[in-house]
Amino acid sequence: MLAPSQVSLADLPRLHKGDRPQAEFKQTPEDFQVIEQLDVIDDGEGEHQWLWVRKTGANTNFCAEKIARFAGVSERNVSYSGLKDRQAVTWQWFSIQLPGKETLNWNELNDEEMSVERIIRRTKKLKTGFHRANRFVIRLANVSSREALENLWQGVSEQGVINYFGEQRFGRSGDNVAQAERWLMASRPPRISRSKRSLYLSALRSYLFNEIVAERIRQFGIEGTLTGDCVMLEGSQSVFTVEQWDDELKQRLANNNIYLTAPLAGSTNKPLVKGEADAFEQSLLQPFDSWLQALRKLRVEAARRTILLRVENPEISWQGKDAELRFTLPSGAYATTVLNEIVDLSGESR
């Protein structure tokens, strides 16, 4: 089983230097707010009823189950774009397929944990990963040094952070990774739900990504290049292989027109890294060959993820020793990776 430190962001290299101030976080759900950024149009008709839901201290799956029970259908009929934190106040869209039915009185679902704030009808369901970003509002209490936090926040605002997967991806003390490994390595893997399977596979791929990125930062820094690197274009998922770095490509990298990437392990017919970059990644993946074989057997498609994460529309305000941070991250990015760069939350719940 993996030691807890192996999935802890605290043990991974940071982009910004300097001592981080201490602070208190998540004393209440209101200290961590997440607003899904998704532009939708009300079609006025259709068999898919979309719900804009505010939830407090409840996870996304809990709300999906509650919606399904209320409508008297299988949870498979309920869709959402992404999972949101439990220990938080969050806003996100759900859709539920109810062919031939009038709009239900969804307000009957409202309670302290969940509130339906908007209802629309659409001809299409909400697909996973459909939202473009999340807006975060984070409150830090009793910050030990305003100057230290301001300096680190300026660095994050200008340069971004390392795009690690957050610790919540791995469960308590890395339990998701350990359980996923036991499941994959079993002579006869037990049948598990689709959601648990997705959770397990995501935990393994995220762990490998963090390991590769951390070692790359240790050896080469955030802008260190290797022949055969796979880079991603700004504002898209389009990637290409750099056969040889020249001055123009290095300038595009410095200007954040392109980004270095690391692998999300899986099956691929067309390797996207070559030469030095491929040799570096394979040297780190080799000890996990049994994981890689299992991912390929399960036909998990390989992908790439940027190493650098840019923070959009960053803001900071103060009330005494308490700071409020506001910023936007693309879907799939973690606010905890931003916090890890600027504040020491030792002993605090994440």
Swiss-Prot record:
Which keywords does UniProt give here? Isomerase, tRNA processing
- Cite the InterPro entries for this sequence: PsdUridine_synth_cat_dom_sf, PsdUridine_synth_TruD, PsdUridine_synth_TruD_CS, PsdUridine_synth_TruD_insert, TruD_catalytic, TruD_insert_sf, TruD_pseudoU_synthase
Database matches in SUPFAM superfamilies: Pseudouridine synthase
Tell me which residues this entry annotates as catalytic. D85 (nucleophile)
EC top class named in words: isomerase
Q: Does the keyword tRNA processing apply?
A: yes
Q: Which reaction does it catalyse?
A: uridine(13) in tRNA = pseudouridine(13) in tRNA
Tell me the GO molecular function terms: RNA binding; tRNA pseudouridine(13) synthase activity
What's its EC? Answer: 5.4.99.27
Lineage top rank: taxon: Bacteria
Q: Name one GO cellular component term.
A: cytosol
- Which PROSITE patterns does this one have? TRUD, UPF0024
| Matching CDD domains | PseudoU_synth_EcTruD
Domain TRUD: start-end pairs: 160-310
PANTHER family found in the cross-reference section:
TRNA PSEUDOURIDINE SYNTHASE D (PTHR47811:SF1)
Please give the family membership noted in the entry.
Answer: Belongs to the pseudouridine synthase TruD family.
What is the recorded function of this protein according to its Swiss-Prot or TrEMBL entry? Responsible for synthesis of pseudouridine from uracil-13 in transfer RNAs.
* Protein known as: tRNA pseudouridine synthase D
Species for this entry:
Idiomarina loihiensis (strain ATCC BAA-735 / DSM 15497 / L2-TR)
Gene name of this polypeptide: truD
